[in-house]
C-alpha cells in the first residue's frame, strides 16, 4: 500500500504570531501619530479662535468710525443685551457682550473641553488651554490665549516648561 502525504493548507502558529506582532506594532505607531495629530489640531483651532476674535472686535469697532451713533455687534436688533452703541459704550461692554455665551455673536467652543472659548476670567489648571481671555483697560481690549498646557497639566506652557511660549497676546484699541 502506498501512503500519500496529504497536502495540508493553512497557516502555522508561528506565521499567525508574526502577523499579530506586526499588527500590534503598526497599531502602536498609529495611535502615537494620531495623538500627535489631535494635539496639533487643538493648538491650531485655539490660535484660529484667537485671531478670529481679534479681527471681529477690530472690524466691528471700525464701523463706529463710519457711524459714531451706530450700533455694532448686533445679533438680535430687538434685544438690547445683544448690541453695543458706538457713542455710549466701550471696551468693558464689548467684553461683557462677547463673554456672555447666550448673547455673543461669536459661538466658538474651546477645543480642549468643549466649553465656551471666549471668557473674561482666566481659568486655572488644565482648563486654561483653549480659552481667549478678554480684559480691558480704558479703551484697550487685551486678548490672551493659552494654546498648550504645560507638562504637569496644571497651567499654560511657559519657556521653562516646554522651551517655548504657548501664549498669544494681542490688543485692540477702541478709538
Where are the regions that the model predicts?
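N-terminal leader/signal peptides at the extreme start of proteins
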Residues: 1-11
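Alpha-helical hydrophobic helix detector
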Residues: 17-33
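Conserved Walker
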Residues: 12, 29, 44
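Periplasmic/extracellular, small/polar-rich flexible segments of pilin-like filament-forming proteins
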Residues: 62-175
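Membrane-proximal N-terminal amphipathic helix
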Residues: 39-69
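Internal alpha-helical transmembrane segments of multi-pass membrane proteins, especially GPCRs
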Residues: 9, 15-18
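Alpha-helical interaction segments
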Residues: 23-27, 50-51, 102-106
Amino acid at each position: 500500500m502506498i501512503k500519500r502525504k496529504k497536502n495540508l493548507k493553512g497557516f502555522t502558529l508561528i506565521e499567525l504570531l508574526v502577523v499579530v506582532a506586526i499588527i500590534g506594532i503598526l497599531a502602536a505607531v498609529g495611535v502615537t501619530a494620531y495623538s500627535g495629530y489631535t494635539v496639533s489640531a487643538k493648538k491650531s483651532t485655539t490660535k484660529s479662535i484667537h485671531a478670529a476674535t481679534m479681527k471681529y472686535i477690530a472690524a466691528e469697532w471700525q464701523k463706529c468710525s463710519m457711524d459714531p451713533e451706530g450700533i455694532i455687534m448686533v445679533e438680535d436688533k430687538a434685544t438690547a443685551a445683544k448690541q453695543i452703541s458706538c457713542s455710549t459704550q466701550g471696551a468693558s461692554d464689548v467684553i461683557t457682550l462677547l463673554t456672555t455665551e447666550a448673547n455673543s455673536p461669536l459661538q466658538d467652543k474651546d477645543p480642549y473641553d468643549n466649553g465656551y472659548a471666549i471668557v473674561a476670567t482666566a481659568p486655572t489648571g488644565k482648563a486654561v488651554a483653549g480659552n481667549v481671555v478678554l480684559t480691558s483697560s480704558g479703551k484697550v481690549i487685551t486678548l490672551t490665549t493659552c494654546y498648550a498646557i504645560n507638562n504637569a497639566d496644571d497651567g499654560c506652557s511657559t519657556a521653562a516648561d516646554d522651551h517655548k511660549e504657548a501664549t498669544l497676546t494681542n490688543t485692540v484699541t477702541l478709538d
